[in-house]
């Protein structure tokens, strides 16, 4: 008979296939199975079923599927929130269960005393981060709250099992240590992290930060270019190549003319070069440089 973990993992794999094939046929039955199961945080983390359900929710156009998927994610988020609350209580030195009654009974009856075994955590985390120093600074506290909200975008933290509050505190602490104060440089640094972590077109960055592939120390000092999505990096790379090519073409000579009017300075002192940039049966591309202000443009 299949165990609970294997059963949930099987459902997760089937949901992943549906997302890949862009077909939600049978999804409701699988989601109902999950709804009927007593899922723990440990099972969520070990099977990553939360990510599978969330991916289906984002892709599906079936209202019933979306509604049930949202309901599951909401109920699982409560498990994570409860675990986070316990972790915060431990970090703040909250009251721990007293063992005085147990010690008293053992003192009365020494035979009942048994050697204690090391306790295993009931809800192990996949992604853990060291404790973050507490701050009383209002600006820093607000920045930590905003970073926490950014990390919680799209519920990826539920599936990964990350403590967003602790992670946000680590990121803010690294930014503060690098900058040294909460002036404009600090605020701009935090602002750029927020926009990139919340970017719907760049979920990969947020997931890498949540699972620890990108550390708080790294995300705290990364440039906008380094945080950009792979797609945007490719676009920037292509644009840089194109700009270099145009610059090189303009420097290799050309024909001076007064046939073109510069859109920037409105003068007609220009140099143009015609290059076959596409197939031989396509029109040539004309590159124009204004000799007065240096403005460059092209047309076919």
Curated annotation (Swiss-Prot):
Keywords associated with the record: DNA-binding, Isopeptide bond, Metal-binding, Nucleus, Phosphoprotein, Transcription, Transcription regulation, Ubl conjugation, Zinc, Zinc-finger
Modification Phosphoserine, positions: 60, 101
Entries under Gene3D superfamilies matching the protein: 2.20.25.10, Conserved domain common to transcription factors TFIIS, elongin A, CRSP70 (1.20.930.10), Transcription elongation factor S-II, central domain (1.10.472.30)
Subcellular location, principal: nucleus
One GO MF term: DNA binding
Residue numbers spanned by region Disordered: 84-131
Basic and acidic residues: bias regions: 103-117
Entry's localization field: Nucleus
Binding site residues for Zn(2+): 262, 265, 290, 293
Ranges annotated as TFIIS-type zinc finger: 258-298
Classification via PROSITE patterns: TFIIS_CENTRAL (PS51321), TFIIS_N (PS51319), ZF_TFIIS_1 (PS00466), ZF_TFIIS_2 (PS51133)
GO biological process entries: regulation of transcription by RNA polymerase II; transcription elongation by RNA polymerase II
Protein family (similarity comment): Belongs to the TFS-II family.
Name listed for the protein in its UniProt record: Transcription elongation factor A protein 2
Organism: Bos taurus
């Amino acid at each position: 008979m299949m165990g609970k973990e294997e059963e949930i993992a099987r459902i997760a794999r089937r949901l992943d296939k549906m997302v890949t094939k862009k077909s939600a046929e049978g999804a409701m039955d699988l989601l109902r199975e999950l709804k009927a199961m007593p899922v723990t945080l440990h099972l969520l983390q070990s099977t990553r079923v939360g990510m599978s359900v969330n991916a289906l929710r984002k892709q599906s156009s079936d209202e019933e599927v979306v509604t049930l998927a949202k309901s599951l994610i909401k109920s699982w988020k409560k498990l994570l929130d409860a675990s986070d609350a316990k972790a915060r209580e431990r970090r703040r030195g909250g009251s721990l269960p007293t063992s005085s009654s147990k010690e008293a009974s053992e003192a009365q009856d020494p035979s009942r005393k048994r050697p204690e075994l090391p306790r295993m955590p009931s809800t192990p985390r996949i992604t853990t981060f060291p404790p973050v120093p507490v701050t009383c600074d209002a600006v820093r506290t607000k920045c930590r709250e905003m970073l926490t909200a950014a990390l919680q975008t799209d519920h990826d933290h539920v599936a990964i099992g990350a403590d967003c509050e602790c992670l946000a505190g680590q990121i803010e602490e690294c930014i503060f240590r690098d900058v040294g104060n909460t002036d404009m440089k600090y605020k701009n640094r935090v602002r750029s992290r927020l926009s990139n972590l919340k970017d719907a077109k760049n979920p990969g960055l947020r997931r890498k930060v949540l699972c620890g592939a990108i550390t708080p120390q790294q995300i705290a000092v990364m440039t906008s270019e380094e945080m950009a999505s792979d797609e945007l990096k490719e676009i920037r790379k292509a644009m840089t190549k194109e700009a270099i090519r145009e610059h090189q073409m303009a420097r290799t000579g050309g024909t001076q003319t007064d046939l073109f009017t510069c859109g920037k300075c409105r003068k007609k002192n220009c140099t143009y070069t015609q290059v076959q940039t596409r197939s031989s049966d396509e029109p040539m591309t004309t590159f124009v440089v204004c000799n007065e202000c240096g403005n460059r443009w092209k047309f076919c």
